[in-house]
Swiss-Prot record:
Transmembrane segments: none annotated. Pfam families: Ribosomal_L6. This protein binds to the 23S rRNA, and is important in its secondary structure. It is located near the subunit interface in the base of the L7/L12 stalk, and near the tRNA binding site of the peptidyltransferase center. Belongs to the universal ribosomal protein uL6 family. It comes from the Bacteria. GO terms for biological process: cytoplasmic translation. GO terms for molecular function: rRNA binding; structural constituent of ribosome. Part of the 50S ribosomal subunit. This is Large ribosomal subunit protein uL6. Keywords: Ribonucleoprotein, Ribosomal protein, RNA-binding, rRNA-binding. InterPro entries: Ribosomal_uL6-like, Ribosomal_uL6-like_a/b-dom_sf, Ribosomal_uL6_a/b-dom, Ribosomal_uL6_bac-type, Ribosomal_uL6_CS. The gene is rplF. GO terms for cellular component: cytosolic large ribosomal subunit.
Amino acid sequence: MSRVGKKIIDIPSDVTVTFDGNHVTVKGPKGELSRTLNERMTFKQEENTIEVVRPSDSKEDRTNHGTTRALLNNMVQGVSQGYVKVLELVGVGYRAQMQGKDLILNVGYSHPVEIKAEENITFSVEKNTVVKVEGISKEQVGALASNIRSVRPPEPYKGKGIRYQGEYVRRKEGKTGK
């Protein structure tokens, strides 16, 4: 059995989960998420727990078992606690600022780069060099943080660029002279 799939999902008291066939809606204090999950999986919902049950031990069902459980658990965690990704801007003159709900990055290009805020996603800037991406969908938060990082990924010679907080950037030595 899948190690991830067989774990039971605990539901906090302030979160409600409703199933309509294979479509699930999760409501909590931070918002509401809905998604269509794998139609082969079944869900056993008790008072404050949900168990994902697979129909057979075929390879396809085994792989989808853990994925379905992880997606459902991420939705429950998102509406109850939310997700945060923190990015750091490293480099001389690199800075971030808010313009309404959107994020403006000055990262060494001839023009500022504007990142639009998506639905259920908020940005916050601390000390002009630290950007927080917050939201209820783990998938959206991670994708938007990755898009921001891809504007100027950290380079290996000086370490300049946009990196995740705590990310290790492998450094290289420059060319040696004659």
